[in-house]
Amino acid sequence: MADAVTPRDEDYSQWYQDVVRNGQLAENSPARGCMIIKPNGMALWENMRDQLDQMFKDTGHQNYYFPLFIPERYMEREAEHVEGFAKECAVVTHSRLTQDEEGDLVPDPESELGENYIVRPTSETIIWDTYSKWIQSYRDLPLLYNQWANVVRWEMRPRLFLRTAEFLWQEGHTAHATETEAVEEAERMLDVYTTFAEEYMAMPVLQGRKTESERFPGAVDTYCIEAMMQDGKALQAGTSHFLGQNFAKAFDCTFTNEDNEEEYVWATSWGVSTRLIGGLIMTHSDDQGLVLPPKLAPHQVVIVPLFFDDDQEGPVMETCERLQERLEDHGIRVKMDQNHTQSPGWRFSEHELRGVPLRLAIGPRDLENDNVEMARRDTQEKEVVPQDGIAERVSDTLDDIQHALHERAQDRQADNTRVVEDYDAFREVIGRGGFAWAHWDGTPETEARIQEETSATIRLIPFDREDHEEGEDMLTGEPSEGRVLFAQAY
């Protein structure tokens, strides 16, 4: 069995690393700051990817793929964009290696590129250069496209899934004839992310817009969803950007409208990444290891055959195989435990560590009584149930687990969110871990001072701010148009 999991209240950071390791999700790679996603982690990402991909297609989007390498000059054409990403960019300067006099491999001086290439940190620049060729008329609009890719943003303090130099993600890039259409698209895709987080990840999120200092480089407005982790910190789980005409102007992307007038195109971009796996872990997992919502778990059910001699093996395995067929006929993802050399307790613990939502165990006594032992991962509850009607019972139980995980996370968020009126109360909430709704005077100076003194940042400005009362900034006493959400964050 894998190593023990450090309790959350003892060392939350180590607990997270233990859950990732014991859950067989990922490990650090020889390339500093990068991760190796293991089969269990990749299967989880594939389930997330496939569901999101279908949701994108249901809203009219198609997939394409752009190169990993971006000409350096493209990054320079949108000033805010290059400033925001410059410190994170990996740069390709040579096309081959050679051996020096001592036999060591070095970049071949003769292979220096005439132009450097940026390893993709995000694709707005190369995509909008291409869109300027694809778009000529209003008849070419809208363009609703997405790509699944890897990106590189050089990270000095890596943490598996949460911050790595290379990660997997999707990035949508759309082009529109009007500002209204583009804003509606950005809001629509934020709603898609919200639905995915709530209904599939069982992770409650809050919607809003970012402050100017937190806005995506080159965007007019950035919309976001924020989730609360078990330590009370926030995780930015997805962003959708209204880019205005900034990239269209930078890359001279215009179209002829219905009145035969030339206009710049309006744009959006939006994305989520393997960072969502980190959010999933920190929302649901416990001191026994990984906990996964059934809708996304690589295997929703594991069947554990229990027998103690050759005479018992045949009947037990036949029953387990029939059970597997019945469950799979109901669309349930099932794994058969074939590890017959370890003890039942070891095998049970291994599946707990990997987060399988439901465990079914069948032994000789269960055959006699036509029963199955069923154990839930989320509550650790066990019960003996009849094999008759087992597929329907398992399906209902998986639905209940999905709902229960969301309810538990929703309750945690509510219990650790406070409305605060003064700075002392604010510091207390932030200090113990939680979300704080507080008044802010709208200045970047106050925002920066609060972050410096408490490490808390403004996670979002709510869309429904008109429902929030006006007041005074908790720190400066200056007028505030409404409350914003503060928290420490990953």
Curated annotation (Swiss-Prot):
EC number in record: 6.1.1.15
Signal peptide: none
Gene3D superfamilies: Anticodon-binding domain, Bira Bifunctional Protein, Domain 2, C-terminal domain of ProRS
Compartments (UniProt record): Cytoplasm
An annotated Gene Ontology molecular function: proline-tRNA ligase activity
EC class: ligase
One Pfam entry name: HGTP_anticodon
Gene Ontology BP annotations: prolyl-tRNA aminoacylation
Highest taxon in the source lineage: Bacteria
GO cellular component assignments: aminoacyl-tRNA synthetase multienzyme complex; cytoplasm
Predominant cellular place of this UniProt entry's protein: cytoplasm
Keyword line: Aminoacyl-tRNA synthetase, ATP-binding, Cytoplasm, Ligase, Nucleotide-binding, Protein biosynthesis
SUPFAM superfamilies with a match to the protein in the record: C-terminal domain of ProRS, Class II aaRS ABD-related, Class II aaRS and biotin synthetases
Annotated HAMAP family: Pro_tRNA_synth_type3
Record family assignment: Belongs to the class-II aminoacyl-tRNA synthetase family. ProS type 3 subfamily.
PANTHER family with a match to the protein in the record: BIFUNCTIONAL GLUTAMATE_PROLINE--TRNA LIGASE, PROLYL-TRNA SYNTHETASE
Comment text on domains: Consists of three domains: the N-terminal catalytic domain, the anticodon-binding domain and the C-terminal extension.
Its biological purpose: Catalyzes the attachment of proline to tRNA(Pro) in a two-step reaction: proline is first activated by ATP to form Pro-AMP and then transferred to the acceptor end of tRNA(Pro).
Protein name (record): Proline--tRNA ligase
Lineage: Bacteria, Pseudomonadati, Rhodothermota, Rhodothermia, Rhodothermales
Gene transcribed to yield this protein: proS
